[in-house]
């Protein structure tokens, strides 16, 4: 990236706007416009999309398919884990089958697309002709323009409130977490549940689809499911950021504050949260103040089947019990309906905000998705017991259903905020997490209800305090202002079936007898369902369990694992399970880290997950050392320092036994989510022989490929070459002089390309772009060569580089004969057709040496 260019090229433009995706694939311009769709087909296209593409431009939209998965089998499963697994299996299989024909159509037309399984929808970018063709398809139900969805507007106190603390970020703020509760906590009688039932949400996992969470906030860190209890964190399966705003290693973040605030109301310590001993996980479905539909869909999928931070290797068995959604839209689009149905079928209780579009009088101001009939929507009231002026009323503007379902405290709610601070905010966003936390208390106190959505809603409604306001319809007991009334979780729990046994215990050091805090206690029933609690500062734990037979396991750093098996509990039994754990010896762990070429890798970060030990950094010889590591098995993670180039993250196990451990490692090749990888290659320059008609500052030309070239699973017979060092497969473009990091979602519009040296380049009389083909059929190589390209902003020096396509392997090798600035202003890498995946070798880094090469190899996906 160099200095900004003049405004004549302020944004990228299509080189030939009349080209449709299908026309580009065929290599010809359509002679006439596509057939006008029938009235039936046109009705599938929403009006905003019709307007967006009417003038010849492109738009991004969602193609919703007619056929829907049958989730009745999932609902019939007995346990939460079984429900989630069955729902995931059915949804994935159904999407793969029903989307196959549409995907084939799009691939044939060289149209990039992103497929979702939880809502059976496909995200596509295209023009009017493509939209019309899709509308004609019999398998398509509707085509909806992509719209940004805003977070609920909240009223925030200008004053950030900081409670008295002796702890810092990353440290649990107290052993018990009890203080004078916030007004909303006492108003719904959560504090009375703590006292009367000795229940704070133990064994329940709450999730959030929001702006993220400050995971190491002192009042949230202990409850994070990714907290290993020893100072380390496992973020895979516990935090997901489809927006790409958080660090690439999966570390949770919150760049807005909304998500941290709502999470605090659910599980925060010091009287802030309703269920302070529940665990939490989160999906960052909202980039900041806005939430993109594709990120909300990805987040919705992750809730049902959590993945690693790359969105891979789904685990529906790790799905949360409850999910909070404090966001919505006032356009009355039935967005997210399929996701709500999937969550409900999987036994995941969802709480949704009724919205802040009310004025205290007007009816039908609730917003989606809370306004949908299948949603459990929450209105807001203040500390005087009055309905909030902003709270959304029913009946639903979407389907006429009664809304909200219930109301909770939502005015002047103090909770956690990024920067390890606190803020006071108002909105139905603040009311909704009161309900999510209340369900955690209910399910912890009455575990026979876990996963039973209808029964749980009925108990919440029955326990609520009626408020008579029928000006928007309804009755004194259930109306479109208050729903079933004010949340009273104590009464709901009083009404719940109390068949649970109560297990308490204390974990101590066998040698000294001292109490052991932060010991993980896993309790597994005969069906394999696991509930987890962590010991408090005094080594104690407590967990309500249904009658049955269980196995207990106890684990913590520096101690041998303990267990108790065959523990049979009767209904309402009080049972004590104490245990003393044996300290383990410590040993040295050391080794050498090598890069992908086998050379010593200096500056790499080496950490042992599952220990409280600080990470160490490799020296100039690639060596690392931990002086004392307790016996046990730990996750060994090696992260290369920037620039990482083709060096990937190493993940393995370090089993520390009876002596010192020498563990040498070689990091793997980096890969993207599609399985493409890169590696340094042997430099073997191929000179060009045939000139391409390119010249000047911004120009592009389409070249025929001598053999089919696959790019992210799609085969191409032609590609567009630009002066700015790009090979585009989707379109002939100019104006992409401002390079960006990869992947490129939402940036510049450039997608589906290879970037040998994406920079602001220009071709003068001393420059050229050429092609050449070598070898025989089956083993040919095709090179696109940029000779002596100048830098567009007057930077001294030039660049000569090429992209070489290998027919035999499908790989592409990028070679660099001479690059004056060594890539200091360029992007090198590849990106997929939707801009959602890519593999970046470098971005604005001086890492390209003359006479070097890097090869990108196709993945299996």
What annotation goes with each model-predicted range?
Residues 648, 660, 666-861:
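Extracytoplasmic Ser/Thr/Pro-rich, glycosylation-prone low-complexity segments
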Residues 514, 524-544, 600, 610-628:
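Short, acidic Ser/Thr/Gly-rich low-complexity loop/linker segments typical of extracellular
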Residues 35-38, 86, 137-205, 218-219:
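Protease zymogen maturation seam
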Residues 34-160:
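Inhibitory N-terminal propeptides of secreted protease zymogens
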Residues 281-289, 408-477:
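Hydrolase catalytic cores
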Residues 33-37, 56, 73-75, 136, ...:
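Subtilisin-like serine protease catalytic core
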Residues 313-324, 444-506, 532-537, 563-570, ...:
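C-terminal subdomain of the subtilisin-like protease fold in secreted/lumenal serine endopeptidases
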Residues 231-233, 240, 367-444, 486, ...:
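Extracellular S/T/G-rich loop segment that most often corresponds to the catalytic His/Ser-adjacent loop
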């Amino acid at each position: 990236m160099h200095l900004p260019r003049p405004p004549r090229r302020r944004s990228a433009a299509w080189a030939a706007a009349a080209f449709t995706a299908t026309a580009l694939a065929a290599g010809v311009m359509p002679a006439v416009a596509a057939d006008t769709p029938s009235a039936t087909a046109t009705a599938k296209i929403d009006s905003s999309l019709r307007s967006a593409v009417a003038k010849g431009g492109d738009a991004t939209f969602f193609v919703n398919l007619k056929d829907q998965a049958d989730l009745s089998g999932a609902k019939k499963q007995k346990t939460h884990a079984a429900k989630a697994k069955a729902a995931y299996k059915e949804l994935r299989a159904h999407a793969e089958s029903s989307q196959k024909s549409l995907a084939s159509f799009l691939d044939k037309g060289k149209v990039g697309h992103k497929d979702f399984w939880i809502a059976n929808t496909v995200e596509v970018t295209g023009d009017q002709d493509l939209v019309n063709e899709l509308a004609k398809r019999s398998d398509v139900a509707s085509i909806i323009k992509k719209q940004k969805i805003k977070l609920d507007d909240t009223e925030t106190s200008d004053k950030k409130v900081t409670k008295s603390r002796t702890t810092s970020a990353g440290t649990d703020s107290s052993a018990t977490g009890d203080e004078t509760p916030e007004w909303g906590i006492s108003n719904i009688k959560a504090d009375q549940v703590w006292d009367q039932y000795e229940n704070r949400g133990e064994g329940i996992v709450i999730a959030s689809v929001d702006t993220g969470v400050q995971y190491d906030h002192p009042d949230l860190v202990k409850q994070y499911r990714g907290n290993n209890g020893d100072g380390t964190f496992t973020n895979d399966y516990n935090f997901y950021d489809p927006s790409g705003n958080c660090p690439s290693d999966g570390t949770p973040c919150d760049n807005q504050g909304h998500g941290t605030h709502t999470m605090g109301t659910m599980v925060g310590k010091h009287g802030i949260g309703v269920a302070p001993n529940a665990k939490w996980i989160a999906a960052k479905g909202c980039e900041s103040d806005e939430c993109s539909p594709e990120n909300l869909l990805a987040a919705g999928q992750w809730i049902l089947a959590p993945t690693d931070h790359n969105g891979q290797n789904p685990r529906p068995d790790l799905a949360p019990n409850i999910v909070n959604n404090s966001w919505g839209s006032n356009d009355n689009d039935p967005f997210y309906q399929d996701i709500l149905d999937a969550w409900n079928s999987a036994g995941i209780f969802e709480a949704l905000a009724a919205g802040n579009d009310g004025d205290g009088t007007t009816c039908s101001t609730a917003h989606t998705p809370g306004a949908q009939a299948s949603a459990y929507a929450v209105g807001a009231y203040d500390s005087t017991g009055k309905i909030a002026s902003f709270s959304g009323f029913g009946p639903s503007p979407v389907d006429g259903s009664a809304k909200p379902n219930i109301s909770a405290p939502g005015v002047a709610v103090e909770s956690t905020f990024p920067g390890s601070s606190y803020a006071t905010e108002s909105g139905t966003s603040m009311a909704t997490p009161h309900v999510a936390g209340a369900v955690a208390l209910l399910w912890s106190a009455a575990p026979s209800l876990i996963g039973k959505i209808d029964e749980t809603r009925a108990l919440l409604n029955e326990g609520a305090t009626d408020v008579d306001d029928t000006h928007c319809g309804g009755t004194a007991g259930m109306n479109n202002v208050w729903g079933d009334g004010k949340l009273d979780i104590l009464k709901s729990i009083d009404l719940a079936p109390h068949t649970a046994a109560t297990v308490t215990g204390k974990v101590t050091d066998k040698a000294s007898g001292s109490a052991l805090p932060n010991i993980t206690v896993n309790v597994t029933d005969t069906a394999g369902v696991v509930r987890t609690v962590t010991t408090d500062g005094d080594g104690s734990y407590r967990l309500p369990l249904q009658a049955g037979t269980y196995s207990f396991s106890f684990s913590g750093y520096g101690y041998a694992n303990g267990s108790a098996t065959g523990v049979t509990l009767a209904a309402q039994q009080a049972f004590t399970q104490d245990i003393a754990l044996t300290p383990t010896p410590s040993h040295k762990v050391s080794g050498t880290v090598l890069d992908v070429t086998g050379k010593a890798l200096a500056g790499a970060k080496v950490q042992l997950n599952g220990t409280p030990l600080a990470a160490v950094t490799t020296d100039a010889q690639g060596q690392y050392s931990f002086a004392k590591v307790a016996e046990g098995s730990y996750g060994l993670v090696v992260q290369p320092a920037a620039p990482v180039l083709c060096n990937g993250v190493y993940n393995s196990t370090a089993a520390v036994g009876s002596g010192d451990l020498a563990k040498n490692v070689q990091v793997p090749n980096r890969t993207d989510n599609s399985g493409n990888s890169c590696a340094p290659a042997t430099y073997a320059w191929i000179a060009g022989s045939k000139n391409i008609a390119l010249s000047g500052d911004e120009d592009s030309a389409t070249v025929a490929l001598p053999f089919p070239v696959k790019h992210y699973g799609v085969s191409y017979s032609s590609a567009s070459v630009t002066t700015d060092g790009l090979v585009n497969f989707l379109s002939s473009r100019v104006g992409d002089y401002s390079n960006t990091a990869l992947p490129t979602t939402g940036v510049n519009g450039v997608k589906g390309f290879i970037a040998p040296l994406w920079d602001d380049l220009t071709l003068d009389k001393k420059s050229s772009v050429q092609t050449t083909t070598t070898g025989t059929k089956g083993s040919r190589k095709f090179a696109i060569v940029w000779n002596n390209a100048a830098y567009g902003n007057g930077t001294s020096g030039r660049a000569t580089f090429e992209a070489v396509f290998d027919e035999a392997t499908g790989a592409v090798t990028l070679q660099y004969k001479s690059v004056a600035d060594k890539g200091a202003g360029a992007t090198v890498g590849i990106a997929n057709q939707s801009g959602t995946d890519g593999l970046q070798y470098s971005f604005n880094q001086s890492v390209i040496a003359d006479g070097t090469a890097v090869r990108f190899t196709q993945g299996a996906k």
